[in-house]
Design a protein with these regions (language model features):
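Hydrophobic alpha-helical segments that form the core
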Residues: 3-5, 163-185, 193-205
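Amphipathic alpha-helical segments used for helix-helix packing
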Residues: 111-138
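Amphipathic alpha-helical packing segments from all-alpha helical-bundle domains
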Residues: 131-156, 166-174, 208
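Terminal, non-globular segments
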Residues: 20, 90, 124, 154, ...
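Hydrophobic alpha-helical connector segments
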Residues: 87-119
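Short, basic, alpha-helical segments at the C-terminal edge of helix-turn-helix-like DNA-binding modules
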Residues: 45-46, 74-89
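Basic, helix-initiating cap at the start of DNA-binding domains
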Residues: 2-39
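Helix-turn-helix
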Residues: 35-69
Length: 213
């Protein structure tokens, strides 16, 4: 009985500690977002972060080595979730994508993606803004947007060494990053289904066609 009670006490202690860690990281994340928006990441100090999060420096250094480590850890969390959503794309053929386009139905994984972007809107607005991390936009472009474009290309072009194919992919990947940026910068007014349709429509619109959804 004593062993059981001791085990339960240890579990409760661990759970309480886990909750404290989650609470501390959430507070630091909120502080980081606010400070990137107000003074820019380069000007932020660990003292600024601790003061804004109402935490002591010891708590900060229990989890992160410096402010860059803090930022990258949150960026990595976002990129890992995006990668999971992106993996759904591998299950789709070009024929599947075209069928959604013809029926004017949004691709489900794109809807989930924009749902996640909305959920992370405050962080994305800060980190992709002028006071954020200019490297993050490049990561998003290279790891997600490029893969998205490659995924909807006909199979024979996906590994084509022709330089023009590389320029084509680079052009559309950068354009898609611009779409995401514009949506976030303008307050994410469109819902996720509409944004998924916009993303699909932009890829297949032809020269001379009306610029309408």
């Amino acid at each position: 009985m004593a062993k059981t009670q001791g085990h339960m006490a240890l579990q409760d202690s661990t759970q309480n500690e886990d909750r404290r860690i989650v609470k501390s990281k959430r507070a630091l994340r909120g502080a980081l977002i606010t400070l990137m928006e107000t003074k820019g990441f380069e000007a932020i100090t660990v003292n600024d972060l601790c003061s804004a999060a109402d935490l002591n420096r010891g708590t900060f250094y229990n989890h992160f080595s410096d402010k860059e480590d803090l930022l990258v850890s949150f960026e990595n969390e976002v990129m890992e979730t995006i990668a999971l959503i992106r993996s759904e794309m591998a299950l789709l053929s070009v024929k599947d994508v075209m069928a959604y386009c013809v029926s004017k139905k949004p691709l489900p994984f794109l809807v989930r993606l924009f749902d996640y972007f909305r959920e992370q809107g405050d962080f994305l607005h800060a980190v992709m803004g002028p006071g954020g991390d200019p490297r993050f936009g490049s990561r998003l472009r290279d790891s997600f947007c490029t893969n998205l474009i490659q995924g909807v290309l006909h199979e024979k072009y996906r590994n084509d060494p022709d330089p023009f194919v590389g320029y084509y992919i680079s052009f559309y990947a950068s354009a898609y990053l611009g779409v995401i940026n514009h949506w976030i910068d303008t307050g994410m007014k469109e819902d996720s289904q509409t944004m998924a349709l916009i993303a699909m429509r932009l890829l297949f619109i032809k020269p001379g066609e009306p610029i309408r959804l």
